[in-house]
């Protein structure tokens, strides 16, 4: 693999541990002669030399070959939704909790990071989902997600009614708390908590998981990744919401359609050469170790 020469660095430096990791990486890379730029809002929170270059996130995406994101999975998701628009690889340093998307240990970050920057890595394409709300035939909002798109009530613990179509084929109507449409990346997030299956990130598929359905026969459905999923809100619902990765929210009125499909651009995840997906699952989910 080709080495990286132009490196972007960003993170939400809201605690001292994250600040130290960002400052350590900055100092080490500048000392070794790498061309480094920090995301401007990140740099404002750090104690760095004045000569450190800074760029806005869109400009960083245009300039850099790889972006290093320091933080938890939430920080990684936010950065990835923006950076997927550019021809840039993304790697994470875990300063959060589980860290499914952030491979590098902050306490031992420089050795594996330098190995990656020198060309010892592999690339994994992760697809995103897009959501569009259609009101009376016109688009009223769009969003995209790395993990999942969720249809739910704007009230707490409130049942809704909707119909599900896949490629314009009617699947079911249902009364439940909502529906989760997740990518393979998101299959270990909210979807997993709702009883959904774990999908290997290399699969071209998405999973549809209903939330607390008012039926005993409801089960998760896995569909082709190129499918178009349409959710139609019942006319007697109150206002509903679409959430993209738990952040971007759009209002859904009674009778609206929500179109969910693969986003045209993918995220280029960069992993260390020894990355093992099943080791990550076993470690993060606390599965048992080998018996023999």
Curated annotation (Swiss-Prot):
NAD(+) binds at residues 73-74, 147-148, 158, 175, 177, 188-193. One of its GO terms (biological process) is NAD metabolic process. Its cofactor is a divalent metal cation. It comes from the Bacteria. GO terms for molecular function: ATP binding; metal ion binding; NAD binding; NAD+ kinase activity. The active site is at residue 73. Keywords: ATP-binding, Cytoplasm, Kinase, NAD, NADP, Nucleotide-binding, Transferase. Transmembrane segments: none annotated. The keyword Ribosomal protein does not apply. Signal peptide: none annotated. It is found in: Cytoplasm. It catalyses: NAD(+) + ATP = ADP + NADP(+) + H(+). Its EC number is 2.7.1.23. InterPro entries: ATP-NAD_kinase_N (IPR017438), ATP-NAD_kinase_PpnK-typ_C (IPR017437), NAD/diacylglycerol_kinase_sf (IPR016064), NADK (IPR002504). GO terms for cellular component: cytoplasm. SUPFAM superfamilies: NAD kinase/diacylglycerol kinase-like (SSF111331). The keyword Signal does not apply. It holds the Pfam family NAD_kinase_C. HAMAP family: NAD_kinase (MF_00361). Involved in the regulation of the intracellular balance of NAD and NADP, and is a key enzyme in the biosynthesis of NADP. Catalyzes specifically the phosphorylation on 2'-hydroxyl of the adenosine moiety of NAD to yield NADP. Belongs to the NAD kinase family. NCBIfam families: PRK01231.1 (NF002306), PRK03378.1 (NF002893). This is NAD kinase. It comes from Idiomarina loihiensis (strain ATCC BAA-735 / DSM 15497 / L2-TR). The lineage of its organism: Bacteria, Pseudomonadati, Pseudomonadota, Gammaproteobacteria, Alteromonadales. The gene is nadK.
